[in-house]
Amino acid sequence: MKVILLKDVKKLGKKDDVVNVSDGYARNFLFPRKLALEAKESNLNLLNNKKEAERKQKLAELEEAQKLAEELKNQELILKVKSGDNGKLFGSITGKDISDELKKKFKLDIDRRKINVENIRQLGVYDVEIKLYPEVSTKIKVKIEDI
């Protein structure tokens, strides 16, 4: 019997796979636990529609990330922080600081973990990489100034 897996099943397959199993295994184990559906024409159409919708959504997210990357490409953020002698900062600039500044200036909500910051402990201008999507990243200039 062919079934469509609704969840990952060990030693059988991943979610949305169409696999061949014995009738008893399907009726007595997979169906009662809602791990699979019978691979009828209507269920296969549902699966195909679902996969198509997911593909379109990923494509839309990718396009949006690329537009955002173009917008941010040549932008400069200015962070004003306290510093001591020789331009050394009290503490350091983190991804959270940059994320907060992006939220203030551009009204963008970018997760701090997606911002790749080297150790910024001095005043100056730094290139910071922002990963917007698995294949899309951009660099912005961050200027650190004394208050």
UniProtKB/Swiss-Prot annotation:
Biological process annotations from GO: translation
InterPro entries membership: Ribosomal_bL9, Ribosomal_bL9/RNase_H1_N, Ribosomal_bL9_bac/chp, Ribosomal_bL9_C, Ribosomal_bL9_C_sf, Ribosomal_bL9_N, Ribosomal_bL9_N_sf
Record keywords, A-Z: Ribonucleoprotein, Ribosomal protein, RNA-binding, rRNA-binding
GO cellular component terms, semicolon-separated: ribonucleoprotein complex; ribosome
GO MF terms, alphabetically ordered: rRNA binding; structural constituent of ribosome
Pfam families: Ribosomal_L9_C (PF03948), Ribosomal_L9_N (PF01281)
Family statement drawn from the similarity comment of this UniProt entry: Belongs to the bacterial ribosomal protein bL9 family.
Role, per record: Binds to the 23S rRNA.
Protein name: Large ribosomal subunit protein bL9
UniProt organism field: Clostridium tetani (strain Massachusetts / E88)
